[in-house]
């Protein structure tokens, strides 16, 4: 097939400041900052199922973007994501994207 040279460092978030400065940072840094912000806003409240909450926040836009990129080709999308096509179909159904 082909050799995949991209690493997780390729997943970056680009932002433009009010002074028109462009910055890029790894996606993981944005996720970490968002989690810290979320936890700071809890004010001592207990939280459950945080893992599922975070996963849903990332997984749904991931699926949407990959399905658009593959023009709805589930086999290609599953291959790109490194998951079984049946697993992809379950995830699409979970988010009402089937």
Curated annotation (Swiss-Prot):
Transcription regulation as UniProt keyword: yes
Pfam family, any one: HTH_8
Residue ranges of the annotated DNA-binding region, renumbered to this chain: 74-93
Entries under InterPro entries matching the protein: Fis_DNA-bd, Homeodomain-like_sf, HTH_Fis, Trans_regulatory_Fis
Keyword match Magnesium: no
Molecular functions per Gene Ontology: DNA-binding transcription factor activity; sequence-specific DNA binding
Keywords per UniProt: Activator, DNA-binding, Transcription, Transcription regulation
Source domain of life: Bacteria
Stretches that traverse the bilayer: none
Entry similarity comment: Belongs to the transcriptional regulatory Fis family.
Complexes and interactors: Homodimer.
Record's function text: Activates ribosomal RNA transcription. Plays a direct role in upstream activation of rRNA promoters.
NCBIfam families according to UniProt: PRK00430.1
Protein known as: DNA-binding protein Fis
Upper taxonomic lineage: Bacteria, Pseudomonadati, Pseudomonadota, Gammaproteobacteria, Vibrionales
């Amino acid at each position: 097939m082909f050799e995949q040279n991209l690493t997780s460092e390729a997943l970056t978030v680009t932002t433009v400041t009010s002074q028109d400065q462009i910055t890029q940072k790894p996606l993981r840094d944005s996720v970490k900052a968002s989690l810290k912000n979320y936890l700071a806003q809890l004010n001592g409240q207990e939280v459950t199922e945080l893992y599922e909450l975070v996963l849903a926040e990332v997984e749904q836009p991931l699926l949407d973007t990959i399905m658009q990129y593959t023009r709805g080709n589930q086999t290609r999308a599953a291959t790109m994501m490194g998951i079984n096509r049946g697993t992809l179909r379950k995830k699409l159904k979970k988010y009402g994207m089937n």
